[in-house]
Amino acid sequence: MTQAVKLASRVFHRIHLPLQLDASLGSRGSESVLRSLSDIPGPSTLSFLAELFCKGGLSRLHELQVHGAARYGPIWSGSFGTLRTVYVADPTLVEQLLRQESHCPERCSFSSWAEHRRRHQRACGLLTADGEEWQRLRSLLAPLLLRPQAAAGYAGTLDNVVRDLVRRLRRQRGRGSGLPGLVLDVAGEFYKFGLESIGAVLLGSRLGCLEAEVPPDTETFIHAVGSVFVSTLLTMAMPNWLHHLIPGPWARLCRDWDQMFAFAQRHVELREGEAAMRNQGKPEEDMPSGHHLTHFLFREKVSVQSIVGNVTELLLAGVDTVSNTLSWTLYELSRHPDVQTALHSEITAGTRGSCAHPHGTALSQLPLLKAVIKEVLRLYPVVPGNSRVPDRDIRVGNYVIPQDTLVSLCHYATSRDPTQFPDPNSFNPARWLGEGPTPHPFASLPFGFGKRSCIGRRLAELELQMALSQILTHFEVLPEPGALPIKPMTRTVLVPERSINLQFVDR
């Protein structure tokens, strides 16, 4: 009750706007009358809760963005208990908000994840840290991941993983389907690829994800990744007091994170032992390569607990981003054979005569390959929405958003806005090759923007380019006969509503 009173008091206070706001507040429409938080349109609390819990809203949060924008306009608000959220679904307003970011931008933290770290005495990684701790971690990791040259340095390591993926796809064809070329649940296969790839980069070792028999601890980790997003969505939708009455989602979330931390800790401890041997002068040829992220963190004297926290969270982020995007890309290419044929021709011509690793520089120069990935990320952004919590009053459109207000950036809605993307629900990579109007640069932000942008963007793009080039070099990808179209659903991240099954036919 006290929190509700404080919130009401704060909102009332903000109605009486200060005489002088930050200069950024007047950057647009200075002639307009500024309005307060209470003036923002939106559903009643009752209808908002009904939409969320009684109409399957948790699994279609991305669709609610589109419906909200259509009904209330580019900015609206909704309340859940004492928490009021402002939703922004216009690229101009998204840009206006993000341009006002502070030195350490704060987003809505996965509070249940942070609570798990606190209760289980685990270090926060880049996904759960905030403030100065987040800034320290970001500064430490960015040079190793965000610089294009740094990401390109992992191409040799990833090349071996991609070749193993092609071999695994061959082995999986026809298993349990009756069709000789059909691979069931390609997302499951690409989960294994995603973990193997990010594991090789972070730990410098192979995890066995793409072998005929996947190690049990690796299978446990992969299952935990899929499960934790479901439990996260449930725990975030429930007020804290309800966790005591319905303990299942919280217990499941803790189990999932404990399994992932245990997996990461085993592998980090192995790398710690190798680092100790290096310090003792043991010959390098007796140990795995030292060119991996964990090696650099040990060299920078980062604590083992912090390394484990970061490796755990980066493994999670790396698995889901690559697996879902790769699944959606091949799904769309199987349904658009003309695009697939053109892309295969571009890859063949663009990599002919290249050196041992044509995937490095050559693939980054292929315009259609890059356009296909951009179009898939527009249609199926891994994270359909992002958030910010401003540390001061800011202006968005003609509204003043008070400090500490949760603002949700509706990336799914802006990326399917027909005013930005004609025929927005259609797969059309040509829109990124100069065909049609140029969209607002903030209409599609699959990797975010600014200091809070995805730190693994360069690595993810490299993995996707390399995997697609090898898969399309070896296979023609066809849809499952008689399969109905597949829609996305929200599971914290955006995933297929059911398994994607595809045929991989030798070229």
Swiss-Prot record:
Family (UniProt): Belongs to the cytochrome P450 family.
Q: Name one Pfam family in it.
A: p450
* Source species, domain of life: Eukaryota
Job of this protein? A cytochrome P450 monooxygenase involved in vitamin D metabolism and in calcium and phosphorus homeostasis. Catalyzes the rate-limiting step in the activation of vitamin D in the kidney, namely the hydroxylation of 25-hydroxyvitamin D3/calcidiol at the C1-alpha position to form the hormonally active form of vitamin D3, 1alpha,25-dihydroxyvitamin D3/calcitriol that acts via the vitamin D receptor (VDR). Has 1-alpha-hydroxylase activity on vitamin D intermediates of the CYP24A1-mediated inactivation pathway.
Q: List the expressing tissues.
A: Kidney.
Q: Where in the cell is it found?
A: Mitochondrion membrane
Q: Identify the cofactor(s).
A: heme
Enzyme Commission (EC) number = 1.14.15.18
Q: Does the keyword Membrane apply?
A: yes
One GO BP annotation of this record: response to estrogen
Binding annotation for heme = C454
Q: What is this protein called?
A: 25-hydroxyvitamin D-1 alpha hydroxylase, mitochondrial
One GO cellular-component annotation of the UniProt record comes to:
mitochondrial membrane
PANTHER family associated with the record: CYTOCHROME P450, CYTOCHROME P450 FAMILY 27 SUBFAMILY B MEMBER 1
* Effect annotated for changing S408 to A/V/I: Impaired 1-alpha hydroxylase activity toward 25-hydroxyvitamin D3
Q: Which residues form a coiled coil?
A: none
The UniProt GO MF terms for this protein read: calcidiol 1-monooxygenase activity; heme binding; iron ion binding; secalciferol 1-monooxygenase activity
Q: Which reaction does it catalyse?
A: calcidiol + 2 reduced [adrenodoxin] + O2 + 2 H(+) = calcitriol + 2 oxidized [adrenodoxin] + H2O; secalciferol + 2 reduced [adrenodoxin] + O2 + 2 H(+) = calcitetrol + 2 oxidized [adrenodoxin] + H2O; 25-hydroxy-24-oxocalciol + 2 reduced [adrenodoxin] + O2 + 2 H(+) = (1S)-1,25-dihydroxy-24-oxocalciol + 2 oxidized [adrenodoxin] + H2O; 25-hydroxyvitamin D2 + 2 reduced [adrenodoxin] + O2 + 2 H(+) = 1alpha,25-dihydroxyvitamin D2 + 2 oxidized [adrenodoxin] + H2O
Regulation (activators, inhibitors): Activated by cardiolipin and dioleoyl phosphatidylethanolamine (DOPE), phospholipids found in the inner mitochondrial membrane. Inhibited by high substrate concentration.
Q: Which UniProt keywords apply?
A: Heme, Iron, Lipid metabolism, Membrane, Metal-binding, Mitochondrion, Monooxygenase, Oxidoreductase, Transit peptide
Please give the pathway this protein is involved in. Hormone biosynthesis; vitamin D biosynthesis
